[in-house]
Amino acid sequence: MIERPVPGADAPIGIFDSGVGGLTVARTIIDQLPHESVIYIGDTANGPYGPLPIAKVREHAIRIADELVERGCKMIVIACNTASAAFLRDARERYSVPVVEVILPAVRRAVASTRNGKVGVIGTVGTINSGAYQDLFSASPSIVVNAVACPRFVDFVERGITSGRQILNIAQDYLEPLQAEGVDTLVLGCTHYPLLSGVIQLAMGDHVSLVSSAEETAKDVLRILSQQDLLADPDMHPEPSYSFESTGDPEIFAQLSRRFLGPIVSQVRQNEG
């Protein structure tokens, strides 16, 4: 375990993803915990993680999480489904600070949401092949789970393409098997996918509930920080700080980040990884 001085309540929350997808989680955390400071690292030089071998994903995740811990973050949020599947168990053994992931919160929400017990899961190849979602759903034997990999979605989001006929056609092809199975709840098992929720909803139909882990993950962050007396005190630190960083091209990352988060992204720093 990496031992560091115990961070105080005024320390930042560290969040990372392979790219911009984790901004969906960061945005929800910032909205729900407005007094918390955040360091966000998008590993765009090495992402997307989905097609990579699990060992390589774990290597990248360790490098970034180690950095966030070394920089004094009081909590690590793995805002990437593929990295959560590859790294969560190791992370909780490796770090003394709490680690939050995005898979269990989505499963919890889906189990509560489904009406007919038929749930679909879409994600990267790495996430789907890991069986992480399927394993967690097995604790609810009344739920029938169908999982489909949608490998091209991440590339579209990373290029800033979140609507249009081309991506809709691809979505319809990916999602047709889930429609045929009659799922009434669809887990967006990649933090990039909420940025395609309009297209995905159109392809699935309004009768299908889309589940994003962002809201539930933010609830976990709030609960754990409260339990460990690590919530930032607005009287002591009324102005939170936000640092957005990319291991790839910071300008491209900044353009996409501002599109999704707005002016809160004043600049994006180059992270040398």
Curated annotation (Swiss-Prot):
EC code(s) of this entry: 5.1.1.3
Binding-site residues for substrate, renumbered to this chain: 17-18, 49-50, 81-82, 191-192
Broad enzyme group: isomerase
InterPro entries: Asp/Glu/hydantoin_racemase (IPR015942), Asp/Glu_race (IPR001920), Asp/Glu_racemase_AS_1 (IPR018187), Asp/Glu_racemase_AS_2 (IPR033134), Glu_race (IPR004391)
PROSITE patterns reported for this sequence: ASP_GLU_RACEMASE_1, ASP_GLU_RACEMASE_2
Keywords associated with the record: Cell shape, Cell wall biogenesis/degradation, Isomerase, Peptidoglycan synthesis
Catalytic activity: L-glutamate = D-glutamate
GO molecular function: glutamate racemase activity
Gene Ontology process terms (BP): cell wall organization; peptidoglycan biosynthetic process; regulation of cell shape
Pathway membership: Cell wall biogenesis; peptidoglycan biosynthesis
Annotated active site: 80 (proton donor/acceptor), 190 (proton donor/acceptor)
Family indicated by similarity: Belongs to the aspartate/glutamate racemases family.
The name this protein goes by in its record: Glutamate racemase
Lineage: Bacteria, Bacillati, Actinomycetota, Actinomycetes, Mycobacteriales
